[in-house]
Amino acid sequence: MKFNIANPTTGCQKKLEIDDDQKLRAFYDKRISQEVSGDALGEEFKGYVFKIMGGCDKQGFPMKQGVLTPGRVRLLLHRGTPCFRGYGRRNGERRRKSVRGCIVSPDLSVLNLVIVKKGENDLPGLTDVEKPRMRGPKRASKIRKLFNLSKEDDVRKYVNTYRRTFTNKKGKTCSKAPKIQRLVTPLTLQRKRARIAEKKKRVAKAKSEAAEYQKLLASRLKEQRDRRSESLAKKRSRLSAAAAKTASVSA
């Protein structure tokens, strides 16, 4: 079985392969998020405590938290749930997918562990090396929270603290910093004012067009009523003339 061991304090990760069943027996029948002592893995892991974060079996089916079985089950999953990506599906569509339970069994090929407590000895590549966290926050409000800034302070110069310097393919030395999102500048305020002015202009135009339409509709209805009243008057005159003619003939 392979072990993916991660150390959050140093940001390092290492993969180990252990074939001895006696060493692996300490992890069997344990659930995800349970803590296991590393003494069973060997003398170098003495004093270490690991937390089980997940794993997958030899066919690549992942373990799912909350499924209390050591075997494989088929669950009806929707988009956003663990073990189901859901890309290319319709909204609300669910699919039945095979997942493995959250209990560790010998069928697993990879087990993901996190170091909760450091032991006596250093593990090479895990605890003796520290990788710097290069990626800081991008959002302006989170940068302010990180450096304890007020709204009046300029956020842009604080991003330089985690600016990255590297050499590109042409051999030139370049520096790179994340683009700050949701940064309020005079240009963004100007664009906001322009959007509001454009919206007001559209509303005024719609109101004037609606008023013109109502005016035109009223004139058309008046013309229609006038034509109808004229046709009714002509009809009445024809009927009265015909009635007078029949009365004179009968007399």
Curated annotation (Swiss-Prot):
Where does the record place Basic and acidic residues bias?
220-233
Region Disordered: start-end pairs? 218-251
Please give the Gene Ontology molecular function terms for this protein.
structural constituent of ribosome
Supply the alphabetized keyword list. Phosphoprotein, Ribonucleoprotein, Ribosomal protein
Q: Name one GO cellular component term.
A: ribonucleoprotein complex
Q: Where is the composition biased (Low complexity)?
A: 239-251
> Per the UniProt entry, what is one GO biological process?
translation
Checking Pfam families in the record gives: Ribosomal_S6e
**Post-translational modification (record):** Ribosomal protein S6 is the major substrate of protein kinases in eukaryote ribosomes.
Presence of the UniProt keyword Ribosomal protein in the record: yes
* Matches recorded under InterPro entries: Ribosomal_eS6 (IPR001377), Ribosomal_eS6-like (IPR014401), Ribosomal_eS6_CS (IPR018282)
Extract the PROSITE patterns matched here.
Answer: RIBOSOMAL_S6E
The entry sums up its family as follows: Belongs to the eukaryotic ribosomal protein eS6 family.
Q: What does this protein do?
A: Component of the 40S small ribosomal subunit. Plays an important role in controlling cell growth and proliferation through the selective translation of particular classes of mRNA.
- Annotated protein name in UniProt: Small ribosomal subunit protein eS6
Organism of origin: Asparagus officinalis
